[in-house]
């Protein structure tokens, strides 16, 4: 069984030696290598493996500088929502529960999707929300959370970032990069490199412009950003997995007249 070695070092304390994490099973992986590099307020993480991994694992090169972002609503002290970049054509929702083994309902996240700009990507996400193809997001978890960065979910097969599939097959190509990671609430596809989109996605909690041209943006949180922040604030283990299960207890599509 092949293993993946992960080294984590803290740029805030350069004198501290890197911390070694336990090996991660990569027997299901099907690509070659991936790297997540973070700069600024959070840790630098690098991954390497001679064993391929699935196209569902998130590849991000991150360097965070705080900038101002435009807002169109402030629904609570915890909720600041970035202005939509384009016309919203569909609305979907996640009802989120947090806790072990069965969580307490934490609230609803409503997401607007940009179907005119990225119709294939939007249709994939919409159908996974409704479950109309016989599989989808209901009952899956947010398996990876990095504060001041993003929350990641969508692996309804394995729940660890190595599974998931699109409604078109295992993966599909990057549709385009018309839209940008302009601020909190932006919804974007996780991938393992170019043209490896499946079902995994992430919701930004900051502006992440360094991801432009690498990940396909296709939606925006329009209600429930306080629930996104609640997920972001969950305690995580050294692999960025929330210690309490964060589950999409229910999900689906909303009429355009509803928010």
UniProtKB/Swiss-Prot annotation:
Bias kind Polar residues: ranges: 1-13
Localization per record: Plastid, Chloroplast thylakoid membrane
Membrane topology, record value: Peripheral membrane protein
E.C. numbers: 5.2.1.8
Sequence segments annotated as region (Disordered): 1-21
Any Pfam family: Pro_isomerase
Distribution of this protein across tissues and organs: Ubiquitous.
Similarity field: Belongs to the cyclophilin-type PPIase family.
Name of the protein: Photosynthetic NDH subunit of lumenal location 5, chloroplastic
């Amino acid at each position: 069984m092949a293993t993946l070695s992960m080294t984590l070092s803290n740029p805030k304390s350069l004198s501290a030696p890197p911390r070694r994490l336990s090996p991660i099973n990569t027997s299901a992986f099907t690509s070659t290598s991936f790297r997540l590099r973070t700069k600024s307020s959070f840790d630098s993480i690098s991954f390497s493996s001679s064993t391929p991994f699935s196209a569902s694992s998130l590849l991000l090169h991150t360097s965070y500088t705080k900038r101002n972002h435009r807002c169109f609503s402030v629904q609570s002290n915890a909720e600041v929502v970035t202005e939509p970049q384009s016309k919203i054509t569909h609305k979907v929702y996640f009802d989120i529960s947090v806790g072990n083994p069965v969580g307490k309902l934490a609230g609803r996240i409503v997401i607007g999707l940009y179907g005119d700009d990225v119709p294939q990507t939007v249709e994939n996400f919409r159908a996974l929300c409704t479950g109309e193809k016989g599989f989808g997001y209901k009952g899956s978890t947010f398996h990876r959370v990095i504060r001041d960065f993003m929350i990641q979910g969508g692996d309804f097969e394995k729940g660890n970032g190595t599974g998931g599939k699109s409604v078109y097959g295992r993966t599909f190509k990057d549709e385009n990069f018309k839209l940008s990671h302009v601020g909190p609430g932006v919804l974007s596809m996780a991938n393992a490199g170019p043209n490896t989109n499946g079902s995994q996605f992430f919701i930004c909690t900051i502006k992440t412009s360094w991801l432009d041209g690498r990940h396909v943006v296709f939606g925006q949180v329009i209600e429930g950003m306080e629930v996104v922040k609640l997920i972001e604030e969950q305690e995580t283990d050294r692999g960025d997995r929330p210690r309490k299960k964060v589950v999409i207890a229910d999900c689906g599509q909303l009429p355009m007249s509803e928010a």
